[in-house]
Amino acid sequence: MSSKETNKSALPENESATSTNLSQTSAERIKALRRQKIDVEDLIQKILDGNKTALSRAITLIESQQKKHNSNIKTIIKSCLPHANKSIRIGITGVPGVGKSTFIESFGLQLISEGKKVAVLAVDPTSSITRGSILGDKTRMEKLVLEQNAFIRPTASGESLGGVARKTRESILLCEAAGYDVILVETVGVGQSETAVHSMTDFFLLLKLAGAGDELQGIKRGIIEMADAIVINKADGENIKAAKNAKVEFNRALHMYPAKQNGWSPKVKLASALKNEGIDKVWSMISKYFETTKNNGYFEQKRIDQNKFWLKQSIEDALKKNFYQNETIKKALPEIFRKIEANETTPFEAAEYLLDLLNQN
C-alpha cells in the first residue's frame, strides 16, 4: 500500500462526516432564524435583559443593507436610547503587529475581574477584495470570548468608513442598553479610521511598540494629538530597556503639544499584555481620566459635541447616497467623466452642473 493510500485510510472519516453534518445543521439553523419574522418588542426586551443572542441579532439588522429593515432598526435604537449613554467608551488603535487583540483580551479580563461587563467592537473599513475584519476569528481572544460578561463583535467590513462608523456607533448604544459598562472600540490603525473612532469614544488609547530609537518616525501628528494616553506594549524581557527609552521619548514629544481643553495631560505607560503586566495601571489611569473630565464638565460636553458631529455626518451621508442613487445623475456621470478625461471641463464646473441637474428633478 502506498504512503498516500495509508494516509488516506488513516483519516477519521466518521469524524469528518460528523463535522460536515454539524456545519450543514448550523447553516440551516441560521437560515431558519433569518426567515423568522422579527418580533421587535420581544427583541428590545431581550436586549435590555442583557441577552447576547438578541444583541447580536439587533446588530446584524443594523449592518443590513436591506431597506425593509430600516423601520425595525429605528424602533430598536429609539427604544434602547433611554437606557444607553451610561458606559465608558474607549478607542484603541495601533498598527498591525502591535498586539491589539492580546492587549484587548488582557484588558477586558482585567475589567471583568473588577466586576465590569465589557463589549468589544471594531471599526474596519477593509477592502471589498479581502472582506477581512480586525477581530476576524473570535479565537484570537479565546479566553475573553468564554466570559459571561464579555461580548465580542467583529464589525461588518468591505464598505465605506462612513457606513462602518455609523453602524458601530449605533452598536455602541445597543451594547450600553444591554448593560455593558465598558465599550472597547478597536481600529485598524491606518487611514482615517482613527478619526472615526475618536469621534465616538470618550478616551483614545494609542498602542505602540518600542523600536530602536525611531519611535516617533511614521506617526501621524493627528494621532498624537488625539491620544489621551500612549501604552508601549510588549514591554517585557529584552524589550524592557527599549520600552523605557521609548517612554522618555514619547513623554518629551507629548510636552511639545499644546494643553488639551479637557484638563488632562496625556500619559505614557508600559505594559505587557502577554504577561498581564501593567494592565491594571492602564485601567487606573483611565479611571482617573474619567474622574477628572466628569468633575470639570468636559465629559458631558464632549458627548454633546459628538452627537452634533454625527448629526451632520448622517445628513452628509444621506445626501451623498441620494445623489449617487439618482437615475438622472447615473445617466449623466459617464459623459461627465469622459469630458474630464478629455480636459473639456473642470471637476468644479462638472460638479456644479451635476448639482443643478439634481435640483431640477
Ranges and model annotations:
Residues V40-Q45, V98, T155, V231-D236, ...:
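Short hinge/gating elements
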Residues L55-R57, L270, K281-L358:
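Long, well-ordered amphipathic alpha-helical subdomains in the mid-to-C-terminal portions
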Residues M1-P82, K330, P334-E335, A351, ...:
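Non-catalytic terminal/linker segments enriched in charged/polar, low-complexity residues
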Residues V197, A210-K241:
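Flexible active-site lid/hinge loop adjacent to a nucleotide/diphosphate
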Residues I134, S171, A196, M200, ...:
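Alpha-helical scaffold elements adjacent to nucleotide-binding pockets in ATP/GTP-utilizing enzyme cores
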Residues D39-V98, T102-S193, M200-L207, G211-E215:
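Nucleotide-state-sensitive switch-loop elements of NTP-binding domains
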